[in-house]
Protein backbone atom coordinates (compact mmCIF):
# COMPACT_ATOMS: atom_id res chain seq x y z
CA UNK A 1 0.00 0.00 0.00
CA UNK A 2 1.27 3.47 -0.92
CA UNK A 3 0.35 4.91 2.50
CA UNK A 4 1.28 3.24 5.79
CA UNK A 5 -1.83 3.19 7.96
CA UNK A 6 -0.28 0.47 10.14
CA UNK A 7 2.33 2.85 11.56
CA UNK A 8 2.02 3.36 15.33
CA UNK A 9 2.44 7.06 16.11
CA UNK A 10 2.91 8.18 19.71
CA UNK A 11 0.26 10.81 20.40
CA UNK A 12 0.55 10.58 24.18
CA UNK A 13 4.19 11.51 24.77
CA UNK A 14 5.15 13.29 21.55
CA UNK A 15 6.34 16.83 22.33
CA UNK A 16 4.05 18.59 19.84
CA UNK A 17 1.04 16.27 19.91
CA UNK A 18 -1.39 18.12 22.24
CA UNK A 19 -3.93 15.33 21.64
CA UNK A 20 -7.13 15.57 23.65
CA UNK A 21 -7.88 11.95 22.74
CA UNK A 22 -4.70 10.68 24.41
CA UNK A 23 -4.57 13.30 27.17
CA UNK A 24 -3.11 11.70 30.32
CA UNK A 25 -4.24 14.37 32.79
CA UNK A 26 -5.99 13.57 36.06
CA UNK A 27 -8.92 15.67 34.89
CA UNK A 28 -9.40 13.46 31.83
CA UNK A 29 -8.87 10.28 33.86
CA UNK A 30 -11.63 11.32 36.26
CA UNK A 31 -13.94 12.18 33.34
CA UNK A 32 -13.72 8.65 31.98
CA UNK A 33 -13.97 6.93 35.35
CA UNK A 34 -10.34 5.90 35.87
CA UNK A 35 -9.77 7.76 39.14
CA UNK A 36 -6.75 10.05 39.25
CA UNK A 37 -4.55 8.26 36.70
CA UNK A 38 -4.89 6.23 33.53
CA UNK A 39 -3.28 2.78 33.34
CA UNK A 40 -0.09 2.75 31.27
CA UNK A 41 -1.58 0.32 28.76
CA UNK A 42 -4.77 2.25 28.02
CA UNK A 43 -6.12 2.27 24.46
CA UNK A 44 -8.14 5.34 23.50
CA UNK A 45 -10.91 4.79 20.96
CA UNK A 46 -13.44 7.30 22.26
CA UNK A 47 -12.87 10.29 19.99
CA UNK A 48 -13.74 10.53 16.30
CA UNK A 49 -10.32 11.50 15.07
CA UNK A 50 -7.68 9.29 13.49
CA UNK A 51 -4.33 7.98 14.69
CA UNK A 52 -2.95 8.22 11.14
CA UNK A 53 -0.76 10.94 9.70
CA UNK A 54 -2.65 13.12 7.28
CA UNK A 55 -1.98 13.08 3.54
CA UNK A 56 1.59 14.01 2.50
CA UNK A 57 0.46 16.91 0.29
CA UNK A 58 -1.26 18.50 3.30
CA UNK A 59 1.85 18.15 5.47
CA UNK A 60 3.97 19.78 2.76
CA UNK A 61 1.50 22.64 2.33
CA UNK A 62 1.56 23.38 6.06
CA UNK A 63 5.36 23.25 6.09
CA UNK A 64 5.34 26.00 3.47
CA UNK A 65 3.04 28.10 5.65
CA UNK A 66 5.31 27.49 8.64
CA UNK A 67 8.39 28.54 6.69
CA UNK A 68 6.65 31.72 5.56
CA UNK A 69 6.97 32.82 9.18
CA UNK A 70 4.02 35.21 9.35
CA UNK A 71 0.73 33.92 10.74
CA UNK A 72 -1.44 37.00 10.72
CA UNK A 73 -5.13 37.49 10.05
CA UNK A 74 -6.15 35.30 7.13
CA UNK A 75 -9.08 34.83 4.79
CA UNK A 76 -10.42 32.17 2.48
CA UNK A 77 -9.42 33.13 -1.07
CA UNK A 78 -10.62 32.13 -4.53
CA UNK A 79 -8.28 29.13 -4.59
CA UNK A 80 -9.83 27.84 -1.36
CA UNK A 81 -13.39 28.26 -2.64
CA UNK A 82 -12.61 26.64 -5.98
CA UNK A 83 -10.92 23.71 -4.22
CA UNK A 84 -14.05 23.07 -2.13
CA UNK A 85 -16.30 23.24 -5.20
CA UNK A 86 -13.95 20.94 -7.13
CA UNK A 87 -13.96 18.29 -4.40
CA UNK A 88 -17.70 18.01 -4.03
CA UNK A 89 -18.43 18.18 -7.76
CA UNK A 90 -15.93 15.41 -8.56
CA UNK A 91 -16.37 13.21 -5.47
CA UNK A 92 -20.09 13.56 -4.74
CA UNK A 93 -21.56 15.03 -7.95
CA UNK A 94 -22.76 18.01 -5.94
CA UNK A 95 -22.46 21.37 -7.68
CA UNK A 96 -22.56 24.76 -6.00
CA UNK A 97 -20.88 28.11 -6.53
CA UNK A 98 -17.83 29.55 -4.75
CA UNK A 99 -19.96 32.36 -3.31
CA UNK A 100 -22.19 29.75 -1.60
CA UNK A 101 -19.35 28.94 0.83
CA UNK A 102 -18.86 30.50 4.26
CA UNK A 103 -16.00 29.49 6.54
CA UNK A 104 -16.47 28.72 10.23
CA UNK A 105 -13.96 27.75 12.90
CA UNK A 106 -15.37 24.29 13.59
CA UNK A 107 -18.57 22.33 13.11
CA UNK A 108 -19.90 22.94 16.62
CA UNK A 109 -19.49 26.73 16.20
CA UNK A 110 -21.17 26.48 12.79
CA UNK A 111 -24.18 24.72 14.28
CA UNK A 112 -24.35 27.24 17.12
CA UNK A 113 -24.25 30.07 14.55
CA UNK A 114 -27.23 28.52 12.75
CA UNK A 115 -29.14 28.01 16.00
CA UNK A 116 -28.63 31.60 17.12
CA UNK A 117 -29.44 33.17 13.75
CA UNK A 118 -32.52 31.14 12.89
CA UNK A 119 -34.19 30.22 16.20
CA UNK A 120 -35.23 31.94 19.41
CA UNK A 121 -34.63 31.03 23.06
CA UNK A 122 -36.83 28.17 24.31
CA UNK A 123 -37.63 26.98 20.79
CA UNK A 124 -37.14 23.30 20.00
CA UNK A 125 -34.35 21.80 17.90
CA UNK A 126 -35.20 18.36 16.48
CA UNK A 127 -32.53 15.64 16.37
CA UNK A 128 -32.78 11.94 15.46
CA UNK A 129 -31.61 9.83 18.40
CA UNK A 130 -29.35 8.17 19.42
CA UNK A 131 -27.43 11.28 18.53
CA UNK A 132 -23.97 12.74 18.29
CA UNK A 133 -23.42 15.38 20.96
CA UNK A 134 -25.58 18.22 19.67
CA UNK A 135 -27.31 18.26 23.06
CA UNK A 136 -24.89 20.65 24.75
CA UNK A 137 -24.76 23.00 21.75
CA UNK A 138 -28.55 23.26 21.81
CA UNK A 139 -29.02 23.68 25.55
CA UNK A 140 -26.10 26.13 25.86
CA UNK A 141 -28.01 28.32 23.39
CA UNK A 142 -31.05 28.18 25.70
CA UNK A 143 -32.98 26.07 23.19
CA UNK A 144 -34.77 22.78 23.81
CA UNK A 145 -33.35 19.47 22.57
CA UNK A 146 -36.18 17.48 20.95
CA UNK A 147 -35.10 13.89 20.37
CA UNK A 148 -36.94 11.69 17.88
CA UNK A 149 -36.09 8.07 18.60
CA UNK A 150 -35.21 5.98 15.56
CA UNK A 151 -36.39 2.42 14.98
CA UNK A 152 -33.73 -0.25 15.56
CA UNK A 153 -33.82 -3.82 14.29
CA UNK A 154 -30.76 -6.07 14.59
CA UNK A 155 -28.47 -3.06 14.79
CA UNK A 156 -29.91 -1.30 11.73
CA UNK A 157 -31.66 2.03 12.29
CA UNK A 158 -34.46 3.63 10.29
CA UNK A 159 -36.38 6.87 10.78
CA UNK A 160 -39.73 6.80 12.54
CA UNK A 161 -41.42 9.23 10.16
CA UNK A 162 -44.64 9.28 12.14
CA UNK A 163 -42.77 10.45 15.24
CA UNK A 164 -40.71 12.88 13.16
CA UNK A 165 -43.81 14.47 11.62
CA UNK A 166 -45.33 14.86 15.08
CA UNK A 167 -42.22 16.77 16.21
CA UNK A 168 -42.11 18.89 13.05
CA UNK A 169 -45.79 19.72 13.41
CA UNK A 170 -45.17 21.30 16.82
CA UNK A 171 -44.93 25.04 16.10
CA UNK A 172 -42.35 25.53 18.86
CA UNK A 173 -39.86 23.34 16.98
CA UNK A 174 -38.16 25.49 14.35
CA UNK A 175 -34.96 23.70 13.30
CA UNK A 176 -34.12 20.10 12.36
CA UNK A 177 -30.48 18.95 12.61
CA UNK A 178 -29.77 15.99 10.32
CA UNK A 179 -26.56 13.99 10.79
CA UNK A 180 -25.65 12.47 7.41
CA UNK A 181 -23.95 9.98 7.60
CA UNK A 182 -25.49 9.39 10.99
CA UNK A 183 -23.29 9.30 14.07
CA UNK A 184 -23.26 6.89 15.94
CA UNK A 185 -25.41 4.41 13.97
CA UNK A 186 -23.48 4.67 10.70
CA UNK A 187 -26.56 5.09 8.50
CA UNK A 188 -26.16 6.84 5.16
CA UNK A 189 -29.61 8.21 4.35
CA UNK A 190 -30.90 7.17 0.94
CA UNK A 191 -32.67 9.42 -1.57
CA UNK A 192 -36.13 8.41 -0.37
CA UNK A 193 -35.30 9.14 3.28
CA UNK A 194 -33.71 12.48 2.42
CA UNK A 195 -36.69 13.45 0.29
CA UNK A 196 -39.19 12.50 2.98
CA UNK A 197 -37.30 14.45 5.66
CA UNK A 198 -37.19 17.52 3.41
CA UNK A 199 -40.83 17.26 2.36
CA UNK A 200 -42.03 17.10 5.96
CA UNK A 201 -39.70 19.89 7.10
CA UNK A 202 -40.92 22.21 4.35
CA UNK A 203 -44.53 21.29 5.00
CA UNK A 204 -44.20 22.63 8.54
CA UNK A 205 -41.71 25.43 7.70
CA UNK A 206 -38.85 23.96 9.75
CA UNK A 207 -35.31 24.91 8.72
CA UNK A 208 -32.93 21.99 8.05
CA UNK A 209 -29.20 21.80 8.86
CA UNK A 210 -27.45 18.78 7.35
CA UNK A 211 -24.18 17.91 9.11
CA UNK A 212 -22.20 16.04 6.45
CA UNK A 213 -18.69 16.06 7.94
CA UNK A 214 -18.41 12.24 7.72
CA UNK A 215 -19.53 12.14 4.08
CA UNK A 216 -16.18 11.14 2.56
CA UNK A 217 -15.86 8.05 4.79
CA UNK A 218 -18.21 5.67 2.99
CA UNK A 219 -18.15 1.88 2.60
CA UNK A 220 -17.45 0.33 -0.78
CA UNK A 221 -20.74 -0.29 -2.56
CA UNK A 222 -22.58 2.48 -0.67
CA UNK A 223 -23.41 5.77 -2.41
CA UNK A 224 -23.54 8.98 -0.41
CA UNK A 225 -26.00 11.57 -1.71
CA UNK A 226 -25.50 15.12 -0.41
CA UNK A 227 -28.88 16.25 0.86
CA UNK A 228 -28.83 19.49 -1.11
CA UNK A 229 -28.15 17.64 -4.36
CA UNK A 230 -31.23 15.46 -3.79
CA UNK A 231 -33.83 17.85 -2.34
CA UNK A 232 -32.62 21.26 -3.52
CA UNK A 233 -31.48 24.24 -1.49
CA UNK A 234 -34.76 25.65 -0.16
CA UNK A 235 -34.73 25.84 3.64
CA UNK A 236 -31.47 23.88 3.88
CA UNK A 237 -27.99 24.61 5.24
CA UNK A 238 -25.20 22.05 4.82
CA UNK A 239 -22.06 21.77 6.96
CA UNK A 240 -18.95 20.15 5.47
CA UNK A 241 -15.38 19.87 6.70
CA UNK A 242 -11.97 18.31 6.13
CA UNK A 243 -11.68 17.35 9.79
CA UNK A 244 -12.93 13.73 9.70
CA UNK A 245 -11.72 12.92 6.19
CA UNK A 246 -8.13 14.09 6.58
CA UNK A 247 -7.61 14.07 10.37
CA UNK A 248 -7.52 17.87 10.53
CA UNK A 249 -9.99 18.59 13.33
CA UNK A 250 -7.41 20.70 15.16
CA UNK A 251 -7.35 23.23 12.30
CA UNK A 252 -11.05 24.07 12.74
CA UNK A 253 -12.04 24.49 9.10
CA UNK A 254 -15.75 23.92 8.52
CA UNK A 255 -17.69 25.20 5.53
CA UNK A 256 -21.29 26.40 5.72
CA UNK A 257 -22.91 25.86 2.31
CA UNK A 258 -25.98 28.00 1.57
CA UNK A 259 -27.71 28.43 -1.79
CA UNK A 260 -31.16 29.57 -0.62
CA UNK A 261 -31.26 33.41 -1.09
CA UNK A 262 -33.52 33.89 1.95
CA UNK A 263 -31.07 32.04 4.19
CA UNK A 264 -28.11 33.90 2.69
CA UNK A 265 -29.77 37.19 3.52
CA UNK A 266 -29.95 36.24 7.19
CA UNK A 267 -26.20 35.58 7.17
CA UNK A 268 -25.54 39.24 6.28
CA UNK A 269 -22.83 40.56 8.55
CA UNK A 270 -21.41 37.11 9.31
CA UNK A 271 -17.66 36.65 9.03
CA UNK A 272 -15.10 34.17 10.27
CA UNK A 273 -11.32 34.35 10.02
CA UNK A 274 -9.50 31.05 9.36
CA UNK A 275 -5.91 30.39 10.32
CA UNK A 276 -3.41 30.20 7.42
CA UNK A 277 -2.57 26.56 8.12
CA UNK A 278 -6.22 25.65 7.70
CA UNK A 279 -6.52 27.45 4.37
CA UNK A 280 -3.43 25.70 3.00
CA UNK A 281 -4.58 22.33 4.34
CA UNK A 282 -8.03 22.57 2.74
CA UNK A 283 -6.58 23.48 -0.65
CA UNK A 284 -4.05 20.63 -0.55
CA UNK A 285 -6.66 18.17 0.73
CA UNK A 286 -9.25 18.94 -1.90
CA UNK A 287 -6.89 19.26 -4.89
CA UNK A 288 -4.02 16.82 -4.21
CA UNK A 289 -5.18 14.13 -1.78
CA UNK A 290 -8.01 12.20 -3.40
CA UNK A 291 -5.97 8.99 -3.72
CA UNK A 292 -5.09 9.17 -0.01
CA UNK A 293 -8.81 9.17 0.88
CA UNK A 294 -9.39 6.19 -1.42
CA UNK A 295 -6.60 4.27 0.31
CA UNK A 296 -7.92 5.30 3.73
CA UNK A 297 -11.39 4.01 2.92
CA UNK A 298 -9.98 0.68 1.74
CA UNK A 299 -8.05 0.32 5.00
CA UNK A 300 -11.06 1.25 7.14
CA UNK A 301 -13.28 -1.17 5.20
CA UNK A 302 -10.92 -4.03 6.03
CA UNK A 303 -10.68 -3.02 9.68
CA UNK A 304 -14.46 -2.84 10.00
CA UNK A 305 -14.87 -6.26 8.37
CA UNK A 306 -12.36 -7.69 10.85
CA UNK A 307 -14.22 -6.12 13.79
CA UNK A 308 -17.60 -7.38 12.58
CA UNK A 309 -16.32 -10.93 12.09
CA UNK A 310 -14.58 -10.90 15.47
CA UNK A 311 -17.77 -9.86 17.29
CA UNK A 312 -19.89 -12.45 15.47
CA UNK A 313 -17.44 -15.29 16.05
CA UNK A 314 -16.08 -14.58 19.53
CA UNK A 315 -18.72 -12.41 21.22
CA UNK A 316 -22.08 -13.69 19.92
CA UNK A 317 -23.99 -12.03 22.76
CA UNK A 318 -22.87 -8.65 21.40
CA UNK A 319 -24.24 -7.10 18.22
CA UNK A 320 -22.93 -4.64 15.68
CA UNK A 321 -23.21 -3.93 11.99
CA UNK A 322 -20.67 -2.55 9.55
CA UNK A 323 -21.62 1.14 9.31
CA UNK A 324 -22.59 2.39 5.86
CA UNK A 325 -20.63 5.56 6.52
CA UNK A 326 -18.23 7.03 9.11
CA UNK A 327 -15.66 5.07 11.09
CA UNK A 328 -17.54 4.32 14.29
CA UNK A 329 -18.98 1.05 15.57
CA UNK A 330 -22.15 1.20 17.65
CA UNK A 331 -21.68 -1.88 19.84
CA UNK A 332 -24.75 -3.39 21.49
CA UNK A 333 -23.84 -5.22 24.72
CA UNK A 334 -27.39 -5.77 26.00
CA UNK A 335 -27.07 -9.51 25.42
CA UNK A 336 -24.78 -9.85 28.45
CA UNK A 337 -27.59 -8.82 30.82
CA UNK A 338 -25.28 -6.44 32.65
CA UNK A 339 -26.14 -2.97 33.86
CA UNK A 340 -24.61 0.04 32.16
CA UNK A 341 -22.37 0.54 35.20
CA UNK A 342 -21.21 -3.09 35.14
CA UNK A 343 -20.34 -2.77 31.46
CA UNK A 344 -18.38 0.42 32.09
CA UNK A 345 -16.51 -1.25 34.97
CA UNK A 346 -15.37 -4.10 32.74
CA UNK A 347 -14.28 -1.77 29.94
CA UNK A 348 -12.50 0.72 32.19
CA UNK A 349 -11.13 -1.28 35.10
CA UNK A 350 -10.50 -4.63 33.46
CA UNK A 351 -9.91 -3.98 29.75
CA UNK A 352 -8.26 -0.56 30.24
CA UNK A 353 -10.11 0.84 27.23
CA UNK A 354 -11.33 4.40 26.79
CA UNK A 355 -14.56 4.17 24.79
CA UNK A 356 -17.65 6.38 24.71
CA UNK A 357 -20.67 5.07 26.57
CA UNK A 358 -23.95 4.93 24.68
CA UNK A 359 -25.73 6.98 27.33
CA UNK A 360 -23.83 10.00 25.96
CA UNK A 361 -25.85 9.58 22.75
CA UNK A 362 -29.19 8.64 24.30
CA UNK A 363 -29.64 8.75 28.07
CA UNK A 364 -32.34 6.05 27.98
CA UNK A 365 -31.93 3.87 24.88
CA UNK A 366 -28.15 4.26 24.73
CA UNK A 367 -27.69 2.29 27.93
CA UNK A 368 -25.54 -0.85 27.45
CA UNK A 369 -24.15 0.44 24.14
CA UNK A 370 -20.61 1.65 23.47
CA UNK A 371 -19.32 3.72 20.56
CA UNK A 372 -15.91 2.61 19.31
CA UNK A 373 -13.92 4.80 16.90
CA UNK A 374 -11.73 2.56 14.76
CA UNK A 375 -9.51 4.83 12.58
CA UNK A 376 -6.31 3.59 14.22
CA UNK A 377 -3.64 1.08 13.16
CA UNK A 378 -5.31 -2.32 12.86
CA UNK A 379 -3.00 -3.89 15.44
CA UNK A 380 -4.29 -1.40 18.02
CA UNK A 381 -7.91 -2.18 17.15
CA UNK A 382 -7.27 -5.92 17.29
CA UNK A 383 -5.68 -5.61 20.73
CA UNK A 384 -8.66 -3.59 21.98
CA UNK A 385 -11.17 -6.17 20.72
CA UNK A 386 -9.16 -9.02 22.24
CA UNK A 387 -9.42 -7.22 25.58
CA UNK A 388 -13.18 -6.87 25.17
CA UNK A 389 -13.40 -10.59 24.48
CA UNK A 390 -11.38 -11.48 27.59
CA UNK A 391 -13.48 -9.39 29.97
CA UNK A 392 -16.91 -10.25 28.55
CA UNK A 393 -16.42 -13.89 27.60
Model-found features: residue ranges?
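N-terminal small-domain helix-loop-helix segment of the aminotransferase-like
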Residues: 2-5, 9-106, 287-288
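Conserved core of the PLP fold type I
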Residues: 71-199, 216-217, 222-230, 237
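PLP-dependent aminotransferase class I/II
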Residues: 76, 235-313, 319-323
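Helix C-cap/helix->beta junction micro-motif
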Residues: 142, 203-204, 234, 351
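Walker B catalytic acidic pair
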Residues: 212
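Conserved active-site segment immediately N-terminal to the catalytic lysine
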Residues: 221-243, 262-266, 353, 370-371
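Conserved PLP-binding catalytic core of the aspartate aminotransferase-like
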Residues: 300-301, 314-350
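PLP-dependent enzyme catalytic core of the Aspartate aminotransferase-like
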Residues: 346-354, 361-393
Amino acid sequence: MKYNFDEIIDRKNAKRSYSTKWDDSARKARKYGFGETFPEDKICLQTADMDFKTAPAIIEAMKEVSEHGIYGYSAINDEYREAVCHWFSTRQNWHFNPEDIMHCNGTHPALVECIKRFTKPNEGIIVLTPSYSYHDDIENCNRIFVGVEMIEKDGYYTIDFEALEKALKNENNTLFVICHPHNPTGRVWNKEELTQMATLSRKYNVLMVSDEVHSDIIRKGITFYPMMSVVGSEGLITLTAVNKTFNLAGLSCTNIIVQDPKIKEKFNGYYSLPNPFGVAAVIAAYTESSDWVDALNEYLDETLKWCYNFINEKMPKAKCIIPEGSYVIWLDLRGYNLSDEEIKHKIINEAHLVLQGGSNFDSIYGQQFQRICIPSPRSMIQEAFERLYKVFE
